[in-house]
């Protein structure tokens, strides 16, 4: 089924927001074939375009915009500092779209195209990565950053979020053919990228109640938590290129299991998902607390049994 139709006009999409006439035209031609499907408008550009030119929401069933953390700077610290701003974009958008659903479509590590271009650009160099491709897509850093992004947007109140692509160098796993430029994007055919496991964690929590975590160093760690029946699941991401000790409390008494996505387990996570899923460690809960050392850019998936 079609979840939603997002309407853009090619001449407006990247620099402004969807005009009422295009919303009405799309609805006129498509609504009969897609009964009950919401028609969403907004911008194919950044939140700045939406904020500068709020759309006529009376013609829309929802509002959409894109997010990427590399409009200005590309270093890891800047990308981490951009995580919290994602929450703020949703809160600001809520101010002019009211109760309409907010769809972030999509979230990417790099801008999908050059919004600053005012004329046709020269063809990309076939020996270089396309401008929209970040070689960190296949990295542990991307997985940790994505944990923070999901947390930030969900806490902000986004109704739906589309991330990345399914396969290829902007996706969750490599294609069967492999990277077109393996010397620049160092994946291998069929490789499962670390970010895949963040979405596996989310999929495993379908229908669960999501909980809020609190931490005292927001630029060092990020995380997600859910409760589903007697299961308590927590994903903790190390946002730093150094090891860090994390204390989880209050933790249910008994034992916890943890599956670690880090430099030691990445080989199995990338090639043998069945094996990686079985690579869990048992941790003791002492005085209502679990202590765990996260390796650089590690994402650790904890599970507790509630009694």
Question: Model regions: which residues?
Answer:
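A structural motif corresponding to the C-terminal end of an alpha-helix
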Residues: 29-35, 91-102, 148-160, 202-209
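C-terminal beta-strand-rich structural cap/linker in extracellular carbohydrate-active enzymes
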Residues: 273-307
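Flexible loop/turn segments at secondary-structure boundaries
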Residues: 47-49, 71-73, 110-114, 168-172, ...
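Carbohydrate-binding surface patches
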Residues: 216-253, 258-265, 300
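Aromatic/acidic polysaccharide-binding cleft in carbohydrate-active enzymes
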Residues: 103-196, 213-219
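Noncatalytic carbohydrate-binding groove/subsite architecture in carbohydrate-active enzymes
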Residues: 3-140
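Structured loop/turn residues at beta-strand edges in well-structured enzyme cores
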Residues: 58, 156, 295
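Trp/Gly-enriched beta-strand surface patches
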Residues: 253-287
């Amino acid at each position: 089924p079609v979840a939603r139709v997002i309407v853009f006009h090619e001449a407006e999409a990247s620099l402004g927001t969807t005009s009422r006439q295009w919303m009405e035209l799309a609805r006129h031609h498509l609504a009969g074939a897609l009964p009950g499907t919401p028609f969403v408008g907004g911008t194919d550009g950044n939140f700045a375009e939406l904020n500068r030119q709020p759309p006529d929401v009376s013609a829309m069933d929802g509002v959409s915009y894109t997010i990427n953390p590399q409009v200005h700077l590309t270093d890891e610290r800047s990308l981490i500092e951009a995580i919290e701003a994602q929450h703020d974009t949703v809160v600001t958008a809520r101010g002019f779209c009211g109760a309409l659903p907010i769809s972030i479509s999509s979230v990417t590590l790099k801008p999908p195209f050059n919004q600053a271009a005012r004329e046709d650009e020269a063809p990309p160099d076939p020996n270089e990565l396309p401008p929209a491709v970040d070689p960190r897509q296949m990295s542990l850093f991307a997985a940790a950053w994505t944990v923070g992004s999901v947390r930030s947007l969900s806490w902000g109140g986004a109704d739906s979020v589309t991330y990345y692509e399914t396969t290829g160098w902007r996706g969750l796993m490599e294609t069967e053919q492999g990277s077109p430029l393996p010397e620049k994007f160092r994946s291998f055919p069929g490789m499962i990228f670390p970010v895949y496991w963040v979405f596996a964690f989310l999929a495993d929590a379908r229908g669960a109640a999501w909980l809020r975590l609190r931490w005292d160093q927001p630029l060092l760690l990020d995380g997600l938590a859910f409760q589903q029946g007697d299961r308590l699941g927590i994903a903790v991401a190390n946002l730093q290129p150094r090891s860090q000790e994390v204390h989880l409390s209050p933790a249910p008494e008994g034992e916890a299991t943890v599956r670690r996505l880090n430099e030691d387990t990445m080989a199995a996570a990338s090639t043998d998902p069945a094996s990686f899923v079985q690579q869990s460690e048992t941790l003791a809960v002492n005085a209502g607390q679990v202590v765990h050392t996260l390796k650089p850019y590690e994402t650790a998936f904890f599970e507790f049994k509630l009694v």
